[in-house]
Amino acid sequence: MGILYSEPICQAAYQNDFGQVWRWVKEDSSYANVQDGFNGDTPLICACRRGHVRIVSFLLRRNANVNLKNQKERTCLHYAVKKKFTFIDYLLIILLMPVLLIGYFLMVSKTKQNEALVRMLLDAGVEVNATDCYGCTALHYACEMKNQSLIPLLLEARADPTIKNKHGESSLDIARRLKFSQIELMLRKAL
């Protein structure tokens, strides 16, 4: 089921209902930046939570503010980086892997889609070093998730690997603690 939102446009963005998102923004362009009364999510954050690239692209063309934060002080970039495969994605990958590597291609396709989403947000001017209520940046989360495809994108956008979260850990510290040596090397090169 997922999350239920009090703002219809947020629910539509979360559920990938492009028609509804389009209708709400057409009615009033300020709906592109409306914040849900429950958790402060914007339609852009809702779409990024689920990786809905088409809706994100549409909202960005309608001047959605990429730097608005929700109650956890997270931007859309935090959620785009934290986006994981769904249970259904994993199930399809496992079931289709033996069939001409279709599962592998599905996995690669989903990963590329997430990279495109993050690149879109970076190109739109999202603050790459924005911290959430835990003091974590998108780079912290990318390191925790061992996301070797997003880390170079974030570093290229000038993500700071030395920012410490509220636990006193930088992205580099996280990579070191989790023994992600390739990520640690990437971060060291960025210093």
From Swiss-Prot:
SMART domains: ANK. The gene is ANKRD22. The keyword Nucleotidyltransferase does not apply. The keyword Repeat applies. PROSITE patterns: ANK_REP_REGION, ANK_REPEAT. Keywords: ANK repeat, Repeat. This is Ankyrin repeat domain-containing protein 22. ANK repeats lie at residues 39-68, 72-100, 101-130, 134-163.
